[in-house]
Amino acid sequence: MGARTLIDKKEVVLEVKNLSIDIPVSQGVLHAVENINLHVGRGEILCVVGESGCGKSLTSLAIMGLLPKNAQRTAERLELNKKDLQELTERQLADIRGNRMAMIFQEPMTSLNPSFTIENQLLEPLLRHKELSKADARNQVIEMLELVGIKPAEPRLRQYPHQLSGGLRQRVMIAMSLLCNPDLIIADEPTTALDVTIQAQILELMMSLQEKFNTGILFITHDMGVVANIADRVAVMYAGQIVEEGPVSEIFNNPAHPYTRGLMGCIPVPGKVGQDNHLGTIPGMVPSVVNDFKSCRFGGRWDENYKENFKPCRLTEMPNSRRSYEVNLNEKHLVHFCCDECLHLSEHSLLEGSG
């Protein structure tokens, strides 16, 4: 697998503008996701990458309308095929889920119902969303299972999830997501629970099927190797905010935000990790985002090379915690900084060739 080439001017399937998610906790309000913007084009793979807990999965659940009841979602725009999902009733959303948009979850063993056979679970979306007889639906299920590499498919229909390997279960989930030919698939770390060999097979399968069906994919991961292999565009997420976005080649060759450069520095390079060359790390800890977070979210995590001559984020409080500075490096590469101190420091480090 290699990096994909971005095709311009794709029809936008998903558009998210100023999405925020707040969750009440015992200490106050957790601002889990704050004012993020993203879009996915038809036939495009957008990878959202970031550490565990940065809000990636919550973002996907918010799009699907599957957030827990205590989570509050607000968005200026949340559109699938130019239809605002926020205006739909729960019944209307149920008609869209599994039909026009589908989701592949991280762990197929807990996503598939252990009490029903594979056949019953795959027939359900077709019988619910398509006007098909059970016999025709069954034929489509068999065809799709064979398409995702489960051959022969018919004997598997009578099996239960626990009778399949992890790789086969994930292939079943991929088949289920594609049965109704959706416009958008959200894949939430679908290969994390698999070994590297099966992971490579699943990624290759998803890419080939995505091209065959011209489906837009929002792919959530923390693995930069996966991003390099499958992404058209990348959105880097940190502490509930998207800090950088752009074509995969731009993000890997010209990372601009200090967090993105830190992630790149953590990728092990064969032959360069030994007694004198340690694995790269990002200093400090991810901040708590409970209540009004008015200081720099990346403050205190800058590389020591920068901090020798500069003190990043001397601002301890900002007039508006949701203010940000956006820098267009080119028409497709956008970087977000939370304050002007970070902006100027990052510009200096880029000019010096650091990072």
Where are these regions (language model features)?
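ABC ATPase NBD coupling module
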Residues: L85-A102, R128, E250-P255, P287-F293
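A short, proline-enriched helix->beta-strand linker immediately N-terminal to the Walker B motif
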Residues: L179-D183
